[in-house]
Each structure stands twice: as structure tokens, then as C-alpha cells.
Design a protein with these regions (language model features):
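Pre-Walker A (Motif I) flank of P-loop NTPase domains
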Residues: 2-5
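Hydrophobic anchor at the beta1->P-loop junction of P-loop NTPases
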Residues: 8
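ATP-binding Walker
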Residues: 13-14
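Walker A/P-loop
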Residues: 17
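NTP-dependent small-molecule kinase module
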Residues: 24, 135-199
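A glycine- and Lys/Arg-enriched "phosphate-lid" helix/loop adjacent to the NTP-binding pocket
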Residues: 91, 98-162
Length: 199
């Protein structure tokens, strides 16, 4: 029997990485993240996030992320799921729709078509959105310059947040958690929803 694929989404500073890692540890699942979870992905991550002085169009940024995701799906995620292992992801395709689509203005129809090419039939069984205002998320993050995406202004991150909320309203198998609560409160809400899955 194939494993479950659960993905955590949210703006930077929402706490999604902490919760994804926690759930993977508690459930004995494979923790995966994007971008940069493979040797190829490490190189792509450098260009996507860390090469902040390199001019890059939103479409180029999206295509690099999709290249990383395609390789990640075929080399890590699908083999793990096929072997019966649960996979807990820190970001998946919704991140590209939210950040490069709603945030950067890349055409959503074109992004969806490219996403289909990148991931094929691989879909999460559940996507958990940890919703948090950009102002609070910014206060929670370490006070550094951030990468190419983290360093964008609050208006950009608000567009991303609204994009996520729109995806949660219109797509199947999403669960929205109020990220403004304490870490134990957020964890309890997540665990209550996860208990409904056929682990």
C-alpha cells in the first residue's frame, strides 16, 4: 500500500517547517523540503534563493523551482510513497502558485500547465496551510536580510498569503490552521486533522 503524502504550506515565518519536521518525526515519515532536497536541488536552490544579485525574471524563478520539484518528485517522493513510506513535505506545488503566481504575477494557467509537466500524477493526500499575517511572520523570523524571496516587501508576502487562502478555498484536501496561536495550539489543531487520515 502506498504511503500518505502530507504537505505543509505557508508564508516564510509561519512555522510550517517546524510543524512538518515534528509530524515527520512523530509519524515516522520521510521529511522532504523544497527547494534543495537533492544534490541537484542544492545547486538549483543557490540560484533560486541565494544568488540575490543575479537578475532573474519571475518566470525564470518559477521554472527553476519547477525543475527542482520535478527531479524531487521522481527521485525522492514517488519512490518513498511507492515503498509504503509516508512523506511529509515542507512546500510543494502550491508554493509556486502562491509565490510566483499570486506573488510575482506569473500567469496561473501557465504555471498550472508547467506544474502538471513537473509532477505528473503526484498529489498530496492533504495540504496543511499554516495561515499567518506577513507582519507577524516577519517579526518571528530571524532578523537578517533573508534570501531572494524572504527579503521581498510585506505587500508581496500579503499577495502570497491571499493566494494561499484562495487555493485553500478552491482546491480539494486542504486544511487551514491559524498560525497566530502558540506552537502547542497549532500542533494540536494539526494533529486533530491528521488523526482522520488512514495511517
Amino acid at each position: 500500500m502506498a504511503g500518505l503524502f502530507v504537505v505543509f504550506e505557508g508564508i516564510d515565518g509561519s512555522g510550517k517547517s517546524t510543524q512538518a519536521s515534528r509530524v515527520a518525526h512523530q509519524r515516522g515519515g520521510l521529511f522532504v523540503f523544497e527547494p534543495g532536497d537533492t544534490p541537484m536541488g542544492v545547486d538549483l536552490r543557490h540560484w533560486i534563493l541565494e544568488a540575490v544579485t543575479t537578475p532573474m525574471t519571475p518566470a525564470t524563478e518559477a521554472l527553476l523551482l519547477l525543475a527542482d520539484r520535478s527531479h524531487h518528485v521522481h527521485s525522492v517522493i514517488e519512490p518513498a510513497l511507492s515503498s509504503g513510506r509516508h512523506v511529509i513535505g515542507d512546500r510543494f506545488y502550491a508554493s509556486t502558485l502562491a509565490y510566483q503566481g499570486y506573488g510575482r504575477g506569473v500567469d496561473l494557467g501557465e504555471l498550472r500547465a508547467a506544474t502538471l509537466l513537473a509532477i505528473g500524477d503526484c498529489r498530496p493526500d492533504l495540504t496543511i496551510l499554516i495561515d499567518l499575517s506577513p507582519e507577524v511572520a516577519n517579526d518571528r523570523r530571524a532578523r537578517d536580510q533573508g534570501d531572494r524571496i524572504e527579503s521581498a516587501n510585506l505587500e508581496f508576502h500579503d499577495r502570497v498569503r491571499q493566494g494561499y487562502l484562495e487555493l485553500a478555498r478552491t482546491e480539494a484536501d486542504w486544511f487551514v490552521v491559524d498560525g497566530a496561536g502558540s506552537m502547542p495550539e497549532v500542533a494540536a489543531d494539526i494533529d486533530e486533522r491528521l488523526a482522520q487520515l488512514p495511517w
